[in-house]
From Swiss-Prot:
Zn(2+) binds at H132, H136, H142. SUPFAM superfamilies: Metalloproteases ('zincins'), catalytic domain. Its cofactor is Zn(2+). This is Endoribonuclease YbeY. One of its GO terms (biological process) is rRNA processing. Its EC number is 3.1.-.-. GO terms for cellular component: cytoplasm. The gene is ybeY. It comes from Clostridium botulinum (strain Loch Maree / Type A3). One of its GO terms (molecular function) is RNA endonuclease activity. Binds 1 zinc ion.
Amino acid sequence: MIYIDNRQNKIKVDEEFENKIKEIIDYALKEEKVNIDYEISVIFIDNNSIKEINKDYRNIDKATDVLSFPMLDYEEGEVFKDVYLNYEFDESDLDEGNLVLGDIALSLEKAEEQSKEFGHSFLRETCYLTIHSVLHLLGYDHMEEDEKAIMRQREEEILKSFNLHR
């Protein structure tokens, strides 16, 4: 189950766009071998809102593109398919039978700015940021160079296999 809540009014969001975001989330999860019913919440916000969240949770007082709030715990270097592939989840991890993976806060305003900066479509940028965030929910990180290389490779592989190119 994917919940989308549009809390901004700077970028037009229609059902087709929301469905594409749901499709890329589902696709990325399948690519990462998530073989259980799941729940992810996505909020679309603007730069001011994501700046506030970034300051509150990361103590960084500036707008960013996307923030991820994973609900599962991972040791450094471990990802979902390494730890939870055949795991028996406790009821506390589930909501009405769905594994709660976490929340995504995506600034559509920042995504639009970046799509222009990088010279590709808004859809490609939002799909990339969504994949990036989903991978964070699954334990990927980019704080260390080796982790960053692995995460970037997975992002590009998923984008290409989903037929979204730069």
